[in-house]
Structure formats: structure tokens, C-alpha cells
């Protein structure tokens, strides 16, 4: 890919942005074929592996000649009745996939060059791969905020809208017509028919191009909104004249800022906002969380402007229900499988002076992450480890496994739950999860050996989860310790994948966001 990027002459991309000639280079389709082969080897059966014998540079030259003969479209393989005569002796799916991969390589190379300047400005941000790395940031910043905007990115858009956004950095008309043809022929790349998947791409059609389109869609949102938030956050305060009452002056000066910009007639206009020096933003897939410190009027203005942003920039209909407002002091919110709330804590402080001493009780805000016990029980019930009320049941399907395999499976499920929810401030729910998993493990072993649960416990011991390493046992003891110094939240730096429960919970929440009008 780097060699192709060097041979493509980056200066030509920056000055002219002509992409269509790249579609006639043989090296491009060699790269595309390599991507297609690696993906097909993972997801397709061995019957379709005969594509190895079909690829040759002679085939590529024939494909390029077919592309040259196309009128207004590179890809017209969607209608088999119109193209079966053209593709005699060749697999039309192979041609279609190869052209799609080739177009994706061109877009990825050009997009990486175009976004280099934007990405250079983000190098100063600390980047961590672990999912838990975002929680210390939220723990440090969100308690200083008053309101939270919970935003769901609109999950579908018209193909022509994406073509219009690509016109900002693709200037040659043939490339735009080619992209328009691909998006209209393969609408399943951008329109999800599955209501459980409220994102830009359908789960069964996750191609390299569909992932690129989703990332570009999110990039467009962030590249326009993040600079606006930075400008608003770093804005200067307004200098007032003399006020009769200095207390009122300081209260007003703290919450008011001014923006100055030139209009079409080069006239300066002043737009007044309530100042918000605390704007924090996190994202997970199709979901944005924006924490604000200010009044309810300010938050309503932000929701109004964000709704207009999607309506004007992406030509989507107004969807204010996708942006909910939560007051952090009264409501809790969910994110990445956790339930979060901001609790008001009071503590007694004794201040001793030379001649006197007094006691005060200051109020502080504490970030409180909680493992959702009820929803975890619902997930375990769905996996048939217990019923909906939390009563454990055995896994009869596992009775054909060995004892070590059964113990290992239950132990792995328990360790995954404990590892992911080690940052929970309340461990009672994790105690219950451990009990729910221990009893099904004993019931499964008892059913396999046709004995009682008491006999199984006497044979394997009261602690059925015996596969944990010494370090993991030490971590478990620290997580459930009763001393205050050892009850601190533990965030791990090695969690690279979401807990399966998070995905099921996210799908359930997305279904609740949907309205009959969308369906």
C-alpha cells in the first residue's frame, strides 16, 4: 500500500484530485485482489476458493477494457439479466468484488492523504487501545458537568448525500459518477434493513467499502463539530464596564461570552451565548456523549443546533428524539455496558485555627460506575444459565464435554464478567453473578455424572472455579476486599474487545430509540 501511495504522486492528488485514471492501473487490482482474497478466505466456503485460479493480469486487462466500454458506470453487475452475456466464462461476483475493492483502495489512499493535516492536529491527544482507558477520563471530567447530551447518529442516508459530501475533495466528474453508480447499485452498503443494527452498514454486508463509508461518515461529523466545540470552549470572556454591584458583575461575567464573525456584507455581528468552559465528548460507534456545564437553556440550544446540523449538512429530516438531555444530578446514563451516575457526597472536615476551631461539611461530586445487575441477569437468562428471575439452571447441552472443559467454560465466563466490571463501585452484583454461575456449573456436572449437587461439591470443592491463575486470584481478592484502600475502582489496560453483554444491551437500547415513523 505504501509503494502504491508513493507511485501515485501525492502532489497530483492534492492539486487536481483526479482519481479516475487510477482505476485503470493493474497494480491497483493486484492490491484489491489481495484484500479480497484475505477476506474471502475468512468468511467464505472452500467452494468459492476457486477464485485463485481465475485471477491473472490478462483477466485484469479484460476487466479494465470492460470498464472503459461502460457508459456512465463502472459497476453494473447488480442486474444479472443485463450482464450475463458480458460475463460468459467468468464469475460476475468475482468481477464485482474486484472492482469494489479497487475503488475502495483508491478512496482510502486519497482520503488518507486529504485527512493527513486533520490527523496531525490529533497527535497531541493520548490514544489508548483499551476500552477501559476512556473511563478514567470520564471519571475526571464528567462530575464537573451539569447536563449530558446523549446523541444517536442517524443510521441511514441516501446515496446521493454521500456523493455530495465526497465532492468537497474529489474534483473529477468520472470518479463521482463511478462512486454514484456503486452506491446506487449496492444500496445495502449504506442502508441497513436490520433494525438491530442502527448503523450505516448492515452486519451481513460488511465489506471494505462499507466500513470506509461509515468511517468517512463519522469523520465528516467530527471534523465539523469538534473544532466548533474547541472554539466555543476556548472563547474569551466579555469585558464589562462599571457595575453598581460587583457580586452581580462577577456572576454575569462568568457565564457570558461573545463571538465575532463577518457576514456576507462584511458586517460584524455579535452572537451571545452562555459560556461553557467544560465541553467533553466521547463516542462509541453510532453514539455520542457530550457533557456540558451550564444552564438547561444552553443545552437545549446545543440540541437545536445539532439537529439542524444533520438536517442541513446531510439533508436528513429533523430527528430531535435522537438527542436526549439528561441532568447528571438526577439521572443515570449507560455507556459501554456500565451504568454511570454523579452522586453528591458530603464529608465532615474539622478546621482548627489558633484561637478557635469549627466543623464544616463540604459537598463534592463523585463519579459512580455500577454494573447493571438486573440486565446482566437478563443476559445470562438469554444464554440459559438461569431464568428471568435469576434462579440458576444447568446447561444440559454441555453434559457431553469433559469435566475440565465444563469448569473452564464457566470459569472463563465468570472471569470475563469480573474483569470487565472490576471498575464497579458496588461489588454486591458481582457476588450474585458468581453465585448464579457456580450453581449451574454444579448442576451441569451433577447431571453429567447422574449424581446430586452435594456429591459434586464434595468432589470438586466448594470453589468450582479452579482455573484462575495466582495473579487472577489476587485480583479477585482485591476486588472483593472490604478495606477502603483496596475497594478502589480498577480499570484494566488490556481489554481490547467489548463484553458480549454490551452489544446485546446496545442493540436493545437502539430498538427503544426507534419510532414507528422510522420503521
Curated annotation (Swiss-Prot):
User: Which species is the source of this protein?
Assistant: Cycas panzhihuaensis
GO biological process annotation, one example: mRNA processing
Q: What is this protein called?
A: Maturase K
- Is RNA-binding included in the keywords of this UniProt record? yes
Taxonomy of origin reads: Eukaryota, Viridiplantae, Streptophyta, Embryophyta, Tracheophyta
Which key words are in the record? Chloroplast, mRNA processing, Plastid, RNA-binding, tRNA processing
Function, please? Usually encoded in the trnK tRNA gene intron. Probably assists in splicing its own and other chloroplast group II introns.
Q: Which Pfam families match?
A: Intron_maturas2 (PF01348), MatK_N (PF01824)
Instruction: Tell me the HAMAP family matching this sequence.
Output: MatK
